[in-house]
């Protein structure tokens, strides 16, 4: 009788363990299927891992989708677009400095993630990231190719270079 009881409890524990594992797996898989509003409802699990890391970063909340960008161009609007790649180290160094500058200037800095929307490389003639582009009447007017100048380097731009670029076109930007 004692052995029967032992087998009964062992089976009960095994069943309980399997049940807990199944519930945990369902919770995990459900979270992976969560849609990202920033990326037009794409499932989080389908995004590049570097993009997933940035989903809650306050410096990467102005994502513009390809159709939205095309619409702005077609409507002949004046606006800035910051082309970046979520896995680009120069972008990761530049974005936290650039976004507050845009906010302080009252400019909406649209961010186009080339890692997620590869067609942007060709459509907007982007060779390197980051690239900041000003569009006037839906046509590219000027661009800055490259990020912040690392200390001790002669390559890249200073904060003042970015401030001047934003100030140059700030008055003509449509929201």
Identify the meaning behind each predicted range.
Residues 124-136:
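Structural micro-motif
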Residues 91-92, 119-122, 143-144:
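Extracytoplasmic/secreted cell-surface and envelope-processing proteins
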Residues 80-82, 110-111, 131-134:
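Structural recognition of the beta-strand scaffold that forms the well-ordered cores
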Residues 133-175:
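Non-catalytic, surface beta->alpha helical segment in thiol-disulfide oxidoreductase systems
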């Amino acid at each position: 009788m004692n052995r029967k009881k032992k087998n009964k409890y062992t089976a009960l524990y095994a069943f309980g363990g399997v049940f807990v594992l199944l519930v945990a797996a369902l919770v995990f898989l459900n979270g992976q299927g969560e849609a990202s509003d920033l990326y037009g409802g794409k499932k989080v699990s389908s995004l590049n891992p570097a993009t997933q890391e940035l989903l809650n970063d306050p410096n990467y909340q102005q994502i513009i989708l390809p159709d939205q960008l095309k619409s702005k161009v077609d409507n002949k609007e004046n606006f800035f677009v910051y082309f970046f790649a979520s896995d680009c180290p120069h972008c990761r160094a530049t974005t936290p400095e650039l976004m507050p500058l845009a906010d302080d200037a009252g400019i909406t800095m649209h961010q186009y993630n080339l890692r997620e929307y590869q067609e942007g490389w060709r459509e907007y003639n982007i060779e390197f990231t980051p690239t900041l582009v000003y569009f006037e009447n839906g046509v590219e007017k000027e661009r800055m190719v490259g990020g912040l100048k690392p200390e001790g380097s002669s390559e890249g731009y200073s904060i003042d270079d970015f401030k001047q670029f934003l100030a140059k076109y700030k008055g003509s930007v449509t929201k």
